[in-house]
Amino acid sequence: MKKFLDKDFLLSTEAAKELFHKYAEKKPILDYHCHINPEEIAKDRQFENISQLWLGSDHYKWRQMRSCGVEEKYITGNASDSEKFQKWAETLEKAIGNPLYHWSHLELRRYFGYEGVLNGETAKEVWTICNEKLREKSMSARSMIKQSSVTLICTTDDPVDNLEWHKKIKEEESFDVQVLPTWRPDRALNIEKPGFKDYIARFSEVSGVNITSFKTMKEAFRKRLGFFISSGCRTTDHAPEYIMYVPSSDKEVETIFDKRLSGVALSKEEELKYKTAFMLFAGGEYSKNDLVMELHYGCKRNNNTLVFDKLGPDTGHDCIDNFAPGAQLSNFLDALDSAGQLPRTIIYSLNPNDNAVIGTILGCFQDSSALSKIQQGAAWWFNDHKPGITEQLTSLANLGILSNFVGMLTDSRSFLSYTRHEYFRRILCDLIGSWVENGEYPYDVKILSKIVSDISYDNAVRYFKFKL
């Protein structure tokens, strides 16, 4: 029987062990998509206790606590931090097979030096150990980033953000990790949302463009995008329910935009026509400015109306959606490609059933401008576990070129989540090692070491054109 979480955790062959320990493990981390708050980096936040660091905004953990019948006051309510931690520890011991069990114990070992197991009985001991450690300067926000060997972080930012914290981080000479903004204009895309009109007013104010039409909205978009680029932005992100393609004329879109600003409700077809026009315009701008376009879709958000009304979004009430027509995704990419405006694109679906669809679409739009110009994104959110990661890697290998894959990202709000890169690299090396062990690929260490090193770090540096 193997020891829990030993040095060869998830590594089942000699080839896997060699590839991980000699190569993948030694690569630094490039976190090109996350939800870290740049203000906490700029202020070098020192967390008071492990609950603030672990449970403050982690809806992954909140979902499991609710599944164990924990009262909401111990999750997002006014219970003490120590009580919340106790409830989490009692939940964790039941989470066999869940990646949170692995992530949590990896974090305890890598950052706090705790080699034991967290459960209801050990919660007080772990609480004390972690909180004593968190008082040290070596556990401030920046210090945790540095000790994780992170070289670059891309946050997720709205076009109206002033990026003041990114600027302050850049001016800090003692901190050499790049923290770059990511352009995420979802609120300008979501024309059907109740707050759209107010958001456009804010967008108008910040951009200095009087937005009265789709044409002037595009002018404001270009202006703010230019500001983001001047602040180091190299990638963009969109999170629609799915990638739609319902083309229309410029005149139609102007009419739809004017109708919405006038307070008139839109039909579903009008909504889709606007979103298609918006995304085609956005993709063209990204191509002109040599930016990467990331597309995250396949999520149905805020499913529990009662809880949403109390707690708001991002509290653990989202799920996988199974409506994502591959034909519309393909038509969208084709429209951009036909206009000579298809940027480097990473496609993520939250639904694992879309892996093969995405894998076959990728091959239709590759060209010599980049290695795997159109990429399938890493398994994320509800798929960010051993079977989900393995399935995504295997599908990509079956249908494309795994060696060109840009690899892992945390997609997280936590400064401890960099262990997810280790988790991913172990699974990657184990998968490749199994192919070698089974005689499906030669044991050529020179080639294999380059493949795992590239996927772990180097491909992302090249693909996004980061200057490191």
UniProtKB/Swiss-Prot annotation:
It catalyses: D-glucuronate = D-fructuronate; aldehydo-D-galacturonate = keto-D-tagaturonate. It is an enzyme of class 5 (isomerase). Pathway: Carbohydrate metabolism; pentose and glucuronate interconversion. It comes from the Bacteria. SUPFAM superfamilies: Metallo-dependent hydrolases. Keywords: Isomerase. Its EC number is 5.3.1.12. GO terms for molecular function: glucuronate isomerase activity. The keyword Isomerase applies. It holds the Pfam family UxaC. One of its GO terms (biological process) is D-galacturonate catabolic process. InterPro entries: Metal_Hydrolase, Uronate_isomerase. Belongs to the metallo-dependent hydrolases superfamily. Uronate isomerase family. This is Uronate isomerase. It comes from Endomicrobium trichonymphae.
